[in-house]
Amino acid sequence: MSGEKSSLLLIHPAVTTTPELVESVKKSNVFADSSKLDQFLVNKLNDSSVQLEDEKYSLVYYLTPEKESEIQFPTKLIAVLAQSLRGGGRLFGLSDVYKIDALINGFEVVNSGEQGYHWVKKGTAHTQTAPVALRPKRNTPSGGSKSLPIFAKPSFALPAFKKAEKPKPTGLPTFKKPESPRASVVAEDLDDGDELDGMNEDDSNSDELTASKSKFFDDVAGQDSADSIDEDDLVDDAEKSAITVVTCGKTKTRRRKACKDCTCGLKEAEAQEADAARAAQDRILGKPVKFDEQELTEIDFTIQGKKVGGCGSCSLGDAFRCSGCPYLGLPAFKPGQPISLDTIADDL
């Protein structure tokens, strides 16, 4: 069983349409020394429908119609094929596109030779034995009995820790009550008499300046108070309002409109003004509007010898008249016939 060489032929699904290609590959020199050949579709292996045994095959061949640079192969199957190959097993059919995956999974890439490009799994076939120097035996005592090794008893002394000293109690910080600003100023003045004299001189100068300023503004205020002018005198008579507001005699308030129960005469004055305005309107608008015969007659002179309506359809009736025709509501008439508008004079 150990001398039997098993091979695996993985077939691309597109190759099933050309069975003669599969037979020609089986008869090639690659499978010449194979005693057993297994044949599976690569998609069956990809979907785990077929499980491969570990280290069973010495040769795996992938048959695909694709070009070498366009091969599409599931990268996860490279590890599966590496596990199913024996040490020194060969894998044909893949290209340098998957070279990195081959190196990761323990393959060596072979580019030269009669068999062409293929991968070889690293294993016992390529390992070489190396001599190893053994440790010389120890001389035993004359008695020939082996003595047990003697081990010194370790000492597990616990580490000693020194008790930390307690910190000495410290009292609470004491705070000195601050002195009043006045007292500190007095103390400083007592200590430094020259500085006090300088400050007194500055204070006296500032007091004199303040007194002079107040005197100046008092003089200005006195002049303004002596020459004050009434604000009403600054308004010209022409700028005064021409509206006279009548004060109601009962409520003693200024009103533009008379009260409901006014007895001061404002209500009567307003009524008199309203009557005068109404009478003026009646005089202007009360005159009746009268039209002469020429104004009441609309004649079209576009057709000589024949008189028709102004719009050309006025004589046909309301169905044919425009919305602004003055003959709306009148019966139809003959073109050129004078029409009197006396019937609608009241509406005008």
Curated annotation (Swiss-Prot):
GO cellular component, one term: mitochondrial intermembrane space
Any GO MF annotation of the entry: electron transfer activity
GO biological process: iron-sulfur cluster assembly
Pfam families attached to this UniProt entry: CIAPIN1, DRE2_N
Composition bias type Acidic residues, residue spans: 188-206
Region (Linker): 186-241
Keyword terms: 2Fe-2S, 4Fe-4S, Cytoplasm, Iron, Iron-sulfur, Metal-binding, Mitochondrion
Residue span of region Fe-S binding site B: 311-325
Disordered: annotated segments: 128-148, 162-213
InterPro entries to which the protein is assigned, alphabetical: Anamorsin, CIAPIN1, Dre2_N
Coiled-coil annotated residue ranges, if any: none
Chain positions of motif Cx2C motif 1: 311-314
Subcellular location: Cytoplasm; Mitochondrion intermembrane space
Cofactor(s), by name: [2Fe-2S] cluster; [4Fe-4S] cluster
Residue ranges of the region described as Fe-S binding site A: 248-264
Domain of life of the organism encoding this protein: Eukaryota
Stretches the record annotates as N-terminal SAM-like domain: 1-185
Annotated [2Fe-2S] cluster binding sites: C248, C259, C262, C264
Motif mapping: Cx2C motif 2: 322-325
Positions bound to [4Fe-4S] cluster: C311, C314, C322, C325
Domain comment, as recorded: The C-terminal domain binds 2 Fe-S clusters but is otherwise mostly in an intrinsically disordered conformation. The N-terminal domain has structural similarity with S-adenosyl-L-methionine-dependent methyltransferases, but does not bind S-adenosyl-L-methionine. It is required for correct assembly of the 2 Fe-S clusters.
Subunit (UniProt): Monomer. Interacts with TAH18. Interacts with MIA40.
Role this protein plays: Component of the cytosolic iron-sulfur (Fe-S) protein assembly (CIA) machinery required for the maturation of extramitochondrial Fe-S proteins. Part of an electron transfer chain functioning in an early step of cytosolic Fe-S biogenesis, facilitating the de novo assembly of a [4Fe-4S] cluster on the scaffold complex CFD1-NBP35. Electrons are transferred to DRE2 from NADPH via the FAD- and FMN-containing protein TAH18.
HAMAP family to which the protein is assigned, alphabetical: Anamorsin
Family indicated by similarity: Belongs to the anamorsin family.
Protein name: Fe-S cluster assembly protein DRE2
Gene: DRE2
